[in-house]
């Protein structure tokens, strides 16, 4: 019995000092409150808090409708075939938006949006392929000179003919002028056909750019202000790659599955586009927690307190700044329209979804909303088509 008590006393926990070398103290991972809960509220009116989830849902619908606005007449001019409204609504040529992060105070709402502007990238790529490379060539400059010389000669001859006709037939001056205008417009259309389409693309880019300007956003801000009865501030973050946000990563798959049912093909294309780099596991810095180095004698004499060195330490200790793995899953009625097969499930992944520092290094990590991993972004989208309902899930892991 005494041996059991002695063994318990030896194995019981004993307090140790912070400066003890056997203790490993690591930086604690602090995650923003908005990542933990999708909206953070600091308000005193209890009755207003009950309606905030419904209001935020309507506001997100309004914001998505604003960024999905398009000019059907102008877009149809850039196509040979007729542009149908149904296919335009499910087109991937749009501005993709994530779920909003709402921060409520007593008199203001701060809305953070992550945006991937696919429409702008598409138009810039088309301009580069079709026009910008053409304009740089010497052949194009020679053609412009030829159009100028030939056009001036034709205009001079036509002007002389019109003067003769107006002198001989003064009653028919208006008819001569209309025929002359028709001739001019036909000549301009033939000679500057490519430049006309170039101007259409420039107009589309201007409309896309105007959606992010304050003058056009003011109308949206006024509508959101009427819903919340508060001042509204937008923080729009433009993402370089679409796989940096799980909501934006899953939206193209949902839109493509509404058109056609090539599930595996779309999954492979989206997963292939995600670029994942090899992660080098770095040791956590314990230098700031060693209290012996903060003596008044040696603190000012240290060379390691330079701004570049401190910046390097801070950036190396930042968490969740690199994508380490992605996964997509589609399930539901993914067969063709008139087939009698049942629901299907298809998955594709790339990289690793594990939290590398906690699973391999054994470092402590926080948990979101009770059971969600801090390094994972998870999204579920439910949608319907003519065949039936289907769902899309997306995971993005970061280190």
From Swiss-Prot:
InterPro entries: Ribosomal_uS3m_fun (IPR007980). GO terms for biological process: translation. GO terms for molecular function: structural constituent of ribosome. GO terms for cellular component: mitochondrion; ribonucleoprotein complex; ribosome. It is found in: Mitochondrion. It comes from the Eukaryota. Keywords: Mitochondrion, Ribonucleoprotein, Ribosomal protein. Belongs to the universal ribosomal protein uS3 family. Essential for mitochondrial protein synthesis and required for the maturation of small ribosomal subunits. This is Small ribosomal subunit protein uS3m.
């Amino acid at each position: 019995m005494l041996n059991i008590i002695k063994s318990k006393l030896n194995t019981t926990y004993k307090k140790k000092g912070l400066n003890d070398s056997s203790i490993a103290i690591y930086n604690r991972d602090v995650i923003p409150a908005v990542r933990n809960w999708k909206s953070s509220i600091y308000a005193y009116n209890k009755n207003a808090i009950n309606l905030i989830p419904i209001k935020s849902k309507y506001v997100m619908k309004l914001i998505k409708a604003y960024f999905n606005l398009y000019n059907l007449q102008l877009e149809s001019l850039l196509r040979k075939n007729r542009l149908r409204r149904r296919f335009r609504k499910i087109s991937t040529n749009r501005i993709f938006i994530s779920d909003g992060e709402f921060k409520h105070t007593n008199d203001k709402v701060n809305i953070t949006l992550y945006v991937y502007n696919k429409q702008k990238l598409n138009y810039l790529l088309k301009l580069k392929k079709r026009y910008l490379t053409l304009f740089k060539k010497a052949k194009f400059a020679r053609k412009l000179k030829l159009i100028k010389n030939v056009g001036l000669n034709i205009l001079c001859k036509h002007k002389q003919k019109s003067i003769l006709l107006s002198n001989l037939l003064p009653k028919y001056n208006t008819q001569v002028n209309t025929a002359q205008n028709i001739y001019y417009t036909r000549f301009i259309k033939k000679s500057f056909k490519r430049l006309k389409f170039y101007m259409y693309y420039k107009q589309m880019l201007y409309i896309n750019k105007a959606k992010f300007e304050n003058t056009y956003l003011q109308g949206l801000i006024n509508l959101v202000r009427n819903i919340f009865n508060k001042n509204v501030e937008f923080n729009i973050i433009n993402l370089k790659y679409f796989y940096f946000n799980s909501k934006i990563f899953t939206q193209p798959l949902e839109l493509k599955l509404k058109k056609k049912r090539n599930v595996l093909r779309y999954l492979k294309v989206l997963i292939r586009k995600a670029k994942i780099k090899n992660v080098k596991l770095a040791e956590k810095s314990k230098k700031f927690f060693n209290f012996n180095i903060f003596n008044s004698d040696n603190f000012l004499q240290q060379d390691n307190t330079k701004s570049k060195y401190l910046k390097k330490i801070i950036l190396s200790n930042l968490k969740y700044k690199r994508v380490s793995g992605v996964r997509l899953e589609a399930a539901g009625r993914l067969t063709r329209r008139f087939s009698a097969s049942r629901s299907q499930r298809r998955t594709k992944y790339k990289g690793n979804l594990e939290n590398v520092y906690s699973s391999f290094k054994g470092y402590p990590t926080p948990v979101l909303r009770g059971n969600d991993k801090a390094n994972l972004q998870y999204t579920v989208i439910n949608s319907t088509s003519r065949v039936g309902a289907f769902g899309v899930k997306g995971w993005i892991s970061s280190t």
